[in-house]
Amino acid sequence: MRFYTWKDIERYILMHHDEWKDELYDIEVYPNEMVVYPKSEQGTLQNAVLKKLFPKNITPDNLSIKLDGQGEDLMILYEYEYSPVTVRTLPLFKKAIYEDSIYPTEQLADLSCPVFAFHSYKGGVGRTLSLIAFARAWTNLQKNPENSKLLIIDSDLEAPGLTLIQGDLNDSAFSYLDLLTLIQDNSNVEEIVSTAGNLMGTITLPIETSQQRVEHFFLPTYRYEEQLFDLYASPQTITASRNKEYILAEVLSKLASSLGATAVLVDLRAGISEYSAPLLLDPRVKKYCVTSTSLQSVMGTKQVLSFIAKGLKIKEDTLLPTVFLGMIPETFPRREKQEIKENLLGCFET
């Protein structure tokens, strides 16, 4: 591997954690230096570890690492005083990529109201339409739809679709970004839900069936454009906060319950996005992954499913993701459909 910047070195160290964890407590990498925390003061051990990691780049005196193509060095410092840091499990792609399991060891609290998240690797494959179709089917199955409403959330912070479909939003509405700000600034779930419930506007998302039209609760991405372009809080910043790793699904669930809704439907941001990760990587959330038959869409969906499957203990009640394969040409061979199915299911083989 070639190391063009300090960030390449940091990623490489995280990728090869198993190769140095027995001799070193930690390695911290910065733009101009790398700090090594040896478990022993025997220089030969720590030098051997670094030479094994960077055989072509470490200098003969073991005091720096040469960056490829720049002629610059990254100085190595050795620190023998080390205070252990508690490792946190974060439902974010940038953390999950280096972990054997993306799920916490402790049992998470059950959600009071089910949360369904709709995701796609690529845009334009029918993710939002799948959510609407799901909402229509849900409404159609209820004996009394007016008493079985949904809380539908547009959480796409880069290309909000449902929000734009709704047209002009009045300033008295309440948005997903408003909710994220409340969560960022407060750790008390009950207070967050109470405030959000009081601020919820009158905006609804109408779902029509063959029998009736039901106005479901709707949380748009934003209520004025400046919210969208001048972000303060996001799912990523909230998740990185102390003791808020899995708060998002809990707040959405409890907010739905407080409104009298029976379930939450969330339209996620497409792609490998940290805006979507906290719900995609929460084992309590039911995921629907939407893909077309294109190779790019299928391979991207497989990448997402591989993240979801990392360390997932499959039990009878495990919420495995469901894949919606759409936009299938009439002439698409059955054999190729089967190959796509086997390719995606392979992510969860034990």
Locate predicted features.
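Pre-Walker A adenine-sensing motif
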Residues: 96-110
